[in-house]
Amino acid sequence: MATCFLLRNFCAARPALRPPGRLLREPAGAQRRSYVGGPADLHADLLRGDSFVGGRWLPTPATFPVYDPASGAKLGTVADCGVPEARAAVRAAYDAFSSWKEISVKERSSLLRKWYDLMIQNKDELAKIITAESGKPLKEAQGEILYSAFFLEWFSEEARRVYGDIIYTSAKDKRGLVLKQPVGVASIITPWNFPSAMITRKVGAALAAGCTVVVKPAEDTPYSALALAQLANQAGIPPGVYNVIPCSRTKAKEVGEVLCTDPLVSKISFTGSTATGKILLHHAANSVKRVSMELGGLAPFIVFDSANVDQAVAGAMASKFRNAGQTCVCSNRFLVQRGIHDSFVTKFAEAMKKSLRVGNGFEEGTTQGPLINEKAVEKVEKHVNDAVAKGATVVTGGKRHQSGGNFFEPTLLSNVTRDMLCITEETFGPVAPVIKFDKEEEAVAIANAADVGLAGYFYSQDPAQIWRVAEQLEVGMVGVNEGLISSVECPFGGVKQSGLGREGSKYGIDEYLEVKYVCYGGL
């Protein structure tokens, strides 16, 4: 059930796909790669390990290993880029910018569309790579690839809708012209939880605007970014427009600093933790670079007495357990009004037991894969133990899964209080803590008692209450009687310390455009 949520949401009401471009994989005898504990048919042409700079695959003296979080098996080794490689990538992007910004919007649109076509044509292969490196169930990975590709499709269309303006001034012999121009080279730093979609959501907008990019993918999941490079190259994206420089954790700090401070970089877009975002903002401040940030969340999920409990439970399942709770918009704090509290908790527990099956993402029927690594498991374990020590009740789950490794049981906690770590910190795991409340004002106050504000959800059948709460929640995105809110057509972003700017939608391309005013006199 849970694995279908993402796929269902992205496929709903979609028109038939345009006939795709040429398939990357060979019709027969294509080379495959396998690893212990994984499938024997990962496509070798897409599973690249070198950096991709200036349209070329470049090895580095050092490499780092990438592991399957489900089996612990080694997927392979990837180029470990450092400061020299980062500067070379920025230079390649800068050199390509002068020509890329000058090509027609129709041509940019066409190239992005070809890239989209290749993603759709190779969607099954790309999904397997996501499951192998992130652990998420294959159906969720398939949903992510569609979501990821749709950003390229969307921004291929938005590229042709960048409009300026003409202003009639108070002086009759003057006119004001407003131009929109690409900002320049953009540094793109992406997370591991959506290793494909977080790239195309940024890169699609950047390339559509006429910018060039340097992508630093998360060290846990570099293969998806490199697979996208292979397809971008095949689609005809010019050399230097899309560059990828993977690096290990030991080099992430120095590479990130280069991408934020190099004078040839004009724009930074980052998705990740609030703590890391603050560091990057500090680096960017010295040269006053344009910055977009999508940072941490602590999403409240409020269920009022007037809510349809069954619908609320279905929404809670979708919002909480997608990608094992490892999403920035997943519900972190469940606030349930006293009148329906017991009914909600009972039905929520039943749905979890019935619908969630923990296992390897490649296994049929798996709905929850592993957490990304041991450190993530330890954090979830810490939050659960802290809650229990402070009086919370474990309704279901509450410990590491019997499979061992990076697996953790889907967990539901009741009798939760506001001082517990699972309420004050982002858990980023399959834990649903439930707080009981009495009045609407109390729920809104608890929901807003955080220094972050990415997403919020609530269930109610009271129209007046819906308007009040939607306006009062201090978040960038609100789901009303809906647990899945992400859509390529809608703006994604937060308030407070959850970030700066918006991604996706018609607003996403503006993050990569400068507004220039031209005064035209002597008329």
UniProtKB/Swiss-Prot annotation:
Its EC number is 1.2.1.24. Substrate binds at residues 201, 322, 486. It comes from the Eukaryota. Disulfide bonds join 328-330. Signal peptide: none annotated. Brain, pancreas, heart, liver, skeletal muscle, kidney. Lower in spleen, lung, kidney and testis. The keyword Protein transport does not apply. Pathway: Amino-acid degradation; 4-aminobutanoate degradation. The keyword Kinase does not apply. The active site is at residues 294, 328. The modification N6-succinyllysine is found at residues 114, 123, 172, 253, 390. It catalyses: succinate semialdehyde + NAD(+) + H2O = succinate + NADH + 2 H(+). It is found in: Mitochondrion. Catalyzes one step in the degradation of the inhibitory neurotransmitter gamma-aminobutyric acid (GABA). PANTHER family: SUCCINATE-SEMIALDEHYDE DEHYDROGENASE, MITOCHONDRIAL. This is Succinate-semialdehyde dehydrogenase, mitochondrial. The gene is Aldh5a1.
